[in-house]
Amino acid sequence: TQKGDTLYGGFYTQNEVKDIVAYAQARGIEVIPEIDMPGHSLSAIACYPWLGCGANNQWADFSSPLCLGNDRVLQFCRDVWTELFNLFPSPYVHIGGDEVDMVFWKNCPRCLARMKSNRLADGHALQAWFTNNMQAFFTAHGKRMIGWDEMLDGGHMPSATVMWWRGGNADAAVRATRAGNDVVCCPTTHFYYDYVENDIDVEKILCFDVPAAMTSVDRQHVLGLQGNLWTEHIPSFNRLTY
């Protein structure tokens, strides 16, 4: 971390997670877990350096990825989710898949070997290979996968639900619906509520519409909207309502 950064984080015990899920259920709210993979993994890599590609196992870029050429890493991912299956009854799980810093894979012998053996052209294809493997794992456990729109950059993800967040990339939402994926709209331009109020006001939110390029058939795959409030700098409910 850099000097002046805000300390945030913490953890939940299994009993605390169960309490949250039960509290939400009693109020008609479904809690869906997200463990971002293969990017946004620096916290795990800092604790377990073998999860990374070697060069990214220290505190650096938050989006440092897991080493996808290491079979032990793949088992780690399955083990993490297996524990969560017992805590969250929701049929949905969110794998993240956004903001992956692929430069580490380009310099990792294991990842390069994985790409060669599976005839994967680039980092996007390697991520797609990983995500498809995880989707098969989720399906085998009766779960449906959700991910951010970058996960489609390496190719189609059958049956995945896509969260379109890149406001400057409306084509991502159009491509997803056209491929038959269900989409939740939450672009930064309208639905990132940790942004300053000058950037997003109520009128702009209420005037949101899906990309004009979507046909009537495409629009049938739009499940709805989501407001995102990232809480790194929101330590309390009072700050949330500020």
Question: Which functions belong to the PLM regions below?
Answer:
Residues 144-150, 155-160, 166-242:
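Flexible, acidic glycine-rich loops studded with aromatic residues
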